[in-house]
Amino acid sequence: MDELVVKDLIDRLIDLSFAEDIGDGDHTTLSCIPADAMGKSKLLIKEEGILAGIDVAKEVFHRFDPTMKVEVFIQDGSHVKPGDVAMVVEGKVQSLLQTERLMLNIMQRMSGIATMTHKYVKKLEGTKTRVLDTRKTTPGMRIMEKMAVKIGGGCNHRIGLFDMILLKDNHVDFAGGIHLSLIHISEPTR
């Protein structure tokens, strides 16, 4: 998939997530943290696994507040263990507090998928079998979940209905059988 399309999908998910979580403002943070307060926060790893979502996390911070500084110590695809520091983020405390939960949710989900994928990939080493993903993803998070599969060593099968023909039972049933399905597939569709 085109990198600009991927970036657009990620940006839209981030914007939707901010609207969902922050709404008209984080009333707690805005009422008790001075606007000029500066701070630093680190992403401390709590479980062993494969790290995924660093680039998306950086986009979360910069999309909310372009002045935030992010220093990355561990890249996507790296094996991590409890106590590792993946990154340090520095900037306005209000910005740090309003972005932390979205960043954590994304990274935890992506790292969980990458870790599980990696476990299956390791079990299949030495065979000709590959781990492929499906379209059965969380609505709106498909691109990130598929990125996580790749980071974990798996392969992306197809992104959506648009990038290949995959004849399934429902198609065969509605087309009137496998033979008719195949005839229709060989005809131009557009």
Could you tell me what each predicted segment is?
Residues D2-L182, S186, R190:
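Acidic/glycine-rich phosphate/pyrophosphate-binding loops and surrounding catalytic core
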